[in-house]
Amino acid sequence: MKKLQKYLMILGTIMLSSGISACSKQPDFDVKSYVQSSLDAYYHGEYKDYANLLEISEKDAKKEIEEDFNESIQQQFDDSDNITDKGIADYTEKLTEVKKLAKYKVQDVKEEDGGYTVSVQVEPSNVFQTLQQSSTEVSNEKIKQGLDGNDPEVFASVLTESVQKSLEKNSYGKTVTVKVSVEKDNSGKYGLSDTEMSKLEAAMFPTE
């Protein structure tokens, strides 16, 4: 089950490939709406406001975020023959459920040094903190059933069932406030960088 531990360890990093696009160059750029709609689109699958800000269709916004997310997961298995395509698809579906656990509230915005600092109130989920225990429980169940953990279908079921078990016992910790920067990129558009998204991700889904 060493391979299983490897994928569980990188679970928290998979979701950091945000695919959040930079937004307006305009002076009337609504930072709060941008951050709120970006998080709503990425975590909760609510694309309308995000699409409006980017001036694209909801369909394109959904495609952009889902493709980036799916690709980030697929890359983790590129060097593995230990899981089927269906297994990866099932696993991706479970991680989409994990994303929906995200609890956040965009609060104050301060303009600083040509960019913006945004305060986001976050309730930490313990879904990744319980994953190790969940995987141990599921693995032991499979062993008792006489199943081979190296079998691709068994391996996939252990991954998805481990995530499901942690989803079912999810709880939230004390609210924390995270400050993120919204800055201009090379094209002059404002956006949340992967580094800033990582700050939020680490607060919403701590692994330790």
Question: What does each of the following model-derived ranges do?
Answer:
Residues 1-9:
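Bacterial N-terminal signal peptides that target proteins for export
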Residues 18-22:
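C-terminal motif of bacterial Sec signal peptides marking the signal peptidase cleavage site
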Residues 24-97, 105:
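Core segments of small alpha/beta cavity-forming domains
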Residues 69, 128-173:
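Mixed-charge, low-complexity intrinsically disordered segments
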Residues 100-111:
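Short amphipathic beta-strand and strand-loop transition segments with alternating hydrophobic
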Residues 114-124:
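A short hydrophobic beta-strand element
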Residues 122-128, 184:
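Beta-strand elements of well-folded, non-transmembrane domains
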Residues 140-154, 170-208:
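Short beta-strand edge/turn micro-motifs at domain boundaries
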